[in-house]
Every structure is written in C-alpha cells, then in structure tokens.
A protein has these predicted regions:
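An exposed acidic His-Trp-rich patch
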Residues: 65-116
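Amphipathic, interaction-prone secondary-structure segments
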Residues: 34-75
Length: 137
C-alpha cells in the first residue's frame, strides 16, 4: 500500500501510461487529515466506457477504509463495487463487506467480490476488468 500522499498520487499518475485502453484520466487527491486522504476521478476508455472512482486512504495504517468504482457505457451504469455492509445478506458473507452490483436490478443484485480488498487500491483490478470487456467487444 502507499506510505504517503505523494506515493499515492504517483501511483495514480502512472495508470494512464500503464493501461493502453485508458484514453483520458482526470483525478483529484485531497488530504483530509494528517494521515488520511481521499481521491476521486474518471477514466475514459475506448468503446465509450467510463470508470468513475473514489478511494479513501489511511496512509498511517497503509490501507483503504472506503472505496467506490462505477463503470458506465454510453451513460448507462454497467456495474459497481462498494464495501457498504449488508450483514443480512448471507450470499455476501464469503467476502464481507466487499461486493459487486450487477444487472438485472443493479441496486439490489449483489455478488461477492473476492478480488476487492482494503489492503491496496483496487483500481488496477477494475481497469483489467474493463479491458477484458473491451477485448470481448
């Protein structure tokens, strides 16, 4: 994980060069306290795919404590990841609280997301998922 604000900003800045299907990327990173930060941004891919993201980072603990990743195509929400707890949904227990919202019924159709973690940024994982979608189009 990232030791500092500067490490995290440097990581975000390299994504555009490391993933060929990202056409443009905009992001902002804010320090919310001496040891915590918040990022928000948008990546645009080919095939009119867009990824909006936010990550809340505790630099002292070297981990995320909240995140959100939302994929769109032509303005239509395709899927999203969040760690909002749903303790009464036993189907999500295997990777609590990490899960993915998918169609049909995007808001209520949730599946476990074992690839998500608080131990590091999940952006590379979601970018690879979008790249796989692009390759299958």
């Amino acid at each position: 994980m990232f030791n500092s604000y500067d490490d995290y900003v440097a990581f975000l800045a390299t994504l555009l060069d490391r993933f060929v299907y990202i056409q443009t990327m905009e992001f902002k990173v804010y320090l919310t306290s001496v040891t915590e930060g918040y990022s928000e941004g948008t990546m645009r891919f080919s095939h009119e795919l867009v990824l909006s993201f936010n990550e809340h980072i505790d630099f002292a603990a070297k981990r995320l404590f909240k995140y959100g990743y939302v994929a769109y195509q032509r303005g239509v929400k395709l899927f999203y990841y969040d760690p909002q707890p749903h303790p009464n949904d036993p189907s999500l227990a295997s990777n609590f609280p990490h899960h993915k919202h998918i169609h049909p019924d995007l808001k209520h159709h949730r599946i476990p997301a074992p690839e998500m973690t608080f131990e590091n940024s999940n952006l590379e994982t979601v970018i690879r998922e979008i790249e796989t979608m692009i390759l299958s189009m």
